[in-house]
Amino acid sequence: MAAPKGSLWVRTQLGLPPLLLLTMALAGGSGTASAEAFDSVLGDTASCHRACQLTYPLHTYPKEEELYACQRGCRLFSICQFVDDGIDLNRTKLECESACTEAYSQSDEQYACHLGCQNQLPFAELRQEQLMSLMPKMHLLFPLTLVRSFWSDMMDSAQSFITSSWTFYLQADDGKIVIFQSKPEIQYAPHLEQEPTNLRESSLSKMSYLQMRNSQAHRNFLEDGESDGFLRCLSLNSGWILTTTLVLSVMVLLWICCATVATAVEQYVPSEKLSIYGDLEFMNEQKLNRYPASSLVVVRSKTEDHEEAGPLPTKVNLAHSEI
């Protein structure tokens, strides 16, 4: 069994420190007890070792070399995965099989080592999936919830102090209404400052009367109660309303931009042709005035086909004539 040769190959190919490789080489001959120290770094290979024990039981295979070769294949796969950071498990398997080929010369031991690499592959995939599931993931609605939390904090800080006033309506016997209104007073939030006992008693006594907020003296109690409830509900749920309005505004703006670009008329400016005789052509164009089609008169004469031309005049010899 050429264990030193395999350790040398792993050290040169994978770049591991010699102390770690020496410990792993000793672990190949001492069983699963020494490999437990590297479970936290290289991953757990106990499941792969149990698969090797089921494949090569000692009562069927008296020789322990094949069992140790299979278990060593599990550890070699973990070492290769640790060096490659688990990027490509198929590449890790090929490197593990190459290390087994270099480490063992006999075919039975090589096959057992390759089987260990193959047995460790599904456990490595399962562990990688578990690690990926533990990583934090951002939900799609996280930006909306973040904006809502900011808005809620701002509204809570704005509602920490509010102004309030109380108003009394008294109706006399003659039908006249007398209004008593107090000046606005600042009231702090109950969770920030506890109210004294006398203020609580006065607030309980004031609730027996018709009370209005925001200093509106010419509205009745029912109308003010409905408006107050609506405004309070709006202030509590304003985060979602603001977020929805913002998202819809952005979508409408993008739609307007896309529609404008798609329906815009192409602006084409013809290029001016340069010519040596450009000035002369310009002058000729200015001098020539074309007549309109309405000013042209076409004159046609009727010709008769049956009429023949008249006889030619007689020839006169000028030499025999006397002038």
UniProtKB/Swiss-Prot annotation:
Effect caused by changing residue 278 to A: No effect on interaction with ATG16L1
Location in or out of the cell: Late endosome membrane; Lysosome membrane; Cell membrane; Golgi apparatus membrane
Signal peptide (from-to): 1-35
Glycosylation sites: 90
Membrane spanning residue stretches: 239-259
Record annotation: effect of changing residue 280 to A/V: Impaired ability to activate LC3. Impaired interaction with ATG16L1
Protein name according to UniProt: Transmembrane protein 59
